[in-house]
């Protein structure tokens, strides 16, 4: 019976380990409010009935606190819990962003000897080319640290004067190239009409034509040629003028007849 001690220890340890594992698994996977399941019967109990009972102090559980229930998923593989090592407590790597700097920016309207809050040197950089501006050319920092009078002065300085606007508009007009009307490649919208400009008659020519019209409303070809030569006009111009004058006279006579009937 000298081998009873080691064999008993082996079987007792195996029984204790199985029971503790069942308790932990039941506490982990059981729903809240449900009764814990009893220990699972093992096949080793009947075989150990011949050995005397021994009392051993139970081993402390591996994990001090019970785990929260985990939703079981078929596609997730269970990994045993491993305690993460504590992070280094070196003070060089902690709260570096809260360290105050000597050149902290004071707020407008508060005394300069007050408490300075930790700010990075590039917290309020100067205006750069890619920085967004407001509608009136002021940045966000101008609203924070400038008074109303300073903002009004900056707005007046940034506002363009009417003289500068006139100069810029004149420059744009001068830079616009003029299209050559004789150039066939020019756009047809900007092309000028090929029709001859209207050449109004002078007062002397109009007076002489009116006198001739009073003597005779219709001119012969010889008389038309003579009038055109004297007035320095073409026969076609004299003919058109007489045609227009006859139409005008008919219109005037018609208006007079309508006014009399009324």
UniProtKB/Swiss-Prot annotation:
One of its GO terms (molecular function) is DNA-binding transcription factor activity. Its main location: nucleus. The keyword Transmembrane helix does not apply. Residues 194-253 bind DNA. Keywords: Developmental protein, DNA-binding, Homeobox, Nucleus, Transcription, Transcription regulation. InterPro entries: Abd-B_homeobox_TF, HD, HD_metazoa, Homeobox_CS, Homeodomain-like_sf, Hox9_activation_N, HXA9/HXB9/HXC9. Coiled coil: none annotated. CDD domains: homeodomain. Pfam families: Homeodomain, Hox9_act. One of its GO terms (biological process) is embryonic skeletal system morphogenesis. Transmembrane segments: none annotated. Residues 152-185 are annotated as: Disordered. One of its GO terms (cellular component) is nucleus. Gene3D superfamilies: Homeodomain-like (1.10.10.60). It is found in: Nucleus. Sequence-specific transcription factor which is part of a developmental regulatory system that provides cells with specific positional identities on the anterior-posterior axis. Belongs to the Abd-B homeobox family. This is Homeobox protein Hox-C9. It comes from Oryzias latipes (Japanese rice fish). The gene is hoxc9.
